């Protein structure tokens, strides 16, 4: 009885509602990669229905990327991503958490970012990036770092409060340490639009891996974002690029935020539509392809029109891989894969 008593009611409902029509099998990235029917939405639901042992559930549900693709091909709309979340709740409580996911969550809770960098290292990375903006653009970026008690200018390290028109930016930690062009673009564009940018050293990441671990930690990380918003009291909260992070943030953080929340795509699209943001088209040497992130096309707050409009303005024609954004295939980044 471990399974039915340990997982949430939606998981049990979906397990008994599944008609085993097999529509979900060929659309599941786990199945396409492994060829194992147990690594399909249908197979996973049958494991729940059969009250499978924890070890069996772990092997199958640890390979689900929570991409939600199955939900849009299922005649009943059964969302096995949510089933996976409820099963992982029970598995985590039983001591069977996915190790990588648990490590990332622990990094965020201890350091405020998923890669486990101490706040001083995050500050050093931010300072290095704003100096690159100075060299590239010849302008001094208005970026401030908040440590929970004071604001410092990222460029010279001096204690200084930002102006009244402030954007609290939650970037991806990978944008600070790997895809730094994205972070520099955030700061430069937000400055152009008249915002002083603040990055909290206590929550310098968009990704909420609690979504992949269990509900308790998902809410705990969401509350960390809310605490920074209350402390900084920005004019607007700007969320960087992260699919599942936006899915969770838009549901758990945005409704409780005392400041308006915008995804970076939403904010830039609005300013572009108003004519405030000018985008100069470039000549792409090779075809440009757009592939929707799972949680931009199938998440709680879809983002499909905005990135396409911005991409079209930047490169002109581009290639669509799918007839419908909701059909996009998962990149397998979800869940630590």
What kind of region is each of these model predictions?
Residues 1-64:
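Ferredoxin-type iron-sulfur electron-transfer modules and their immediate structural context
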Residues 4, 41, 274-337:
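Redox cofactor-anchoring modules in respiratory/redox and cofactor-processing assemblies
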Residues 18-24, 67-70, 332-337:
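Cysteine-cluster motifs in flexible loop/terminal segments that predominantly coordinate metals
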Residues 219-227, 267-276:
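Active-site glycine-rich loop that binds ribose-phosphate moieties when present
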């Amino acid at each position: 009885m471990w399974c039915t008593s340990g997982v949430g009611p939606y998981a049990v409902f979906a397990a008994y509602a599944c008609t085993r029509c097999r529509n979900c099998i060929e659309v599941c990235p786990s199945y396409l990669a492994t060829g194992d029917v147990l690594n399909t939405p249908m197979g996973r639901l049958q494991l729940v229905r059969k009250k499978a042992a924890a070890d069996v559930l772990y092997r199958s549900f640890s390979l689900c990327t929570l991409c939600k693709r199955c939900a849009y091909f299922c005649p009943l709309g059964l969302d096995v991503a949510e089933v996976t979340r409820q099963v992982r709740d029970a598995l985590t409580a039983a001591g069977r958490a996915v190790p990588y996911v648990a490590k990332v969550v622990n990094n965020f809770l201890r350091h405020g970012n998923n890669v486990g960098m101490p706040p001083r290292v995050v500050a050093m990375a931010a300072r290095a990036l704003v100096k690159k903006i100075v060299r590239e653009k010849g302008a001094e970026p208005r970026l401030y770092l908040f440590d929970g008690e004071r604001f410092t200018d990222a460029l010279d390290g001096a204690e200084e409060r930002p102006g009244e028109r402030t954007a609290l930016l939650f970037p991806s930690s990978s944008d600070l340490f790997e895809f730094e062009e994205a972070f520099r673009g955030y700061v430069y564009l937000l400055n152009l639009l008249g915002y002083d940018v603040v990055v909290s050293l206590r929550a310098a990441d968009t990704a909420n891996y609690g979504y992949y671990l269990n509900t308790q930690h998902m809410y705990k990380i969401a509350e960390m974002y809310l605490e920074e918003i209350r402390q900084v009291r920005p004019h607007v909260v700007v969320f960087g690029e992260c699919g599942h992070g936006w899915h969770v943030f838009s549901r758990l953080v945005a409704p409780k935020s005392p400041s308006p929340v915008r995804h970076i795509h939403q904010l830039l699209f609005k300013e572009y539509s108003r004519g405030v943001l000018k985008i100069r088209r470039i000549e792409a040497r090779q075809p440009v392809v757009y592939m929707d992130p799972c949680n931009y096309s199938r998440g709680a707050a879809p983002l499909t029109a905005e990135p396409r409009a911005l991409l079209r303005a930047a490169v002109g024609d581009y290639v669509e891989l799918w007839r419908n954004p909701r059909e996009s295939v998962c990149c397998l980044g979800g869940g630590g894969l």
